[in-house]
Amino acid sequence: MAVPKRKTSPSRRNMRRSHHALTAEAFQECPNCGELKRPHNLCNACGHYNGREIVSVEA
């Protein structure tokens, strides 16, 4: 079984974990209804994408 030869220092441990951080989700306001939506995705509230209605949403 593989066993570490030396104890990993806190500095080295934290440098390894530096890439594990979560990134904030990107949202932008829908120009049609003002609801928040993901970029390059159609709006869930009104069904518009790129200024056109793609999906009709019944309210």
UniProtKB/Swiss-Prot annotation:
Listed GO MF terms: structural constituent of ribosome
Entry annotated with the keyword Ribonucleoprotein: yes
GO CC annotation: large ribosomal subunit
GO biological process, one term: translation
Gene3D superfamilies the record matches: Single helix bin
Superkingdom of this protein's organism: Bacteria
Keyword Cell cycle found: no
Alphabetical keyword list: Ribonucleoprotein, Ribosomal protein
One Pfam family this sequence matches: Ribosomal_L32p
InterPro entries listed in its UniProt record: Ribosomal_bL32 (IPR002677), Ribosomal_bL32_bact (IPR044957), Ribosomal_zn-bd (IPR011332)
Similarity-based family: Belongs to the bacterial ribosomal protein bL32 family.
Protein name listed in UniProt: Large ribosomal subunit protein bL32
Gene source species: Rhizorhabdus wittichii (strain DSM 6014 / CCUG 31198 / JCM 15750 / NBRC 105917 / EY 4224 / RW1) (Sphingomonas wittichii)
Upper taxonomic lineage: Bacteria, Pseudomonadati, Pseudomonadota, Alphaproteobacteria, Sphingomonadales
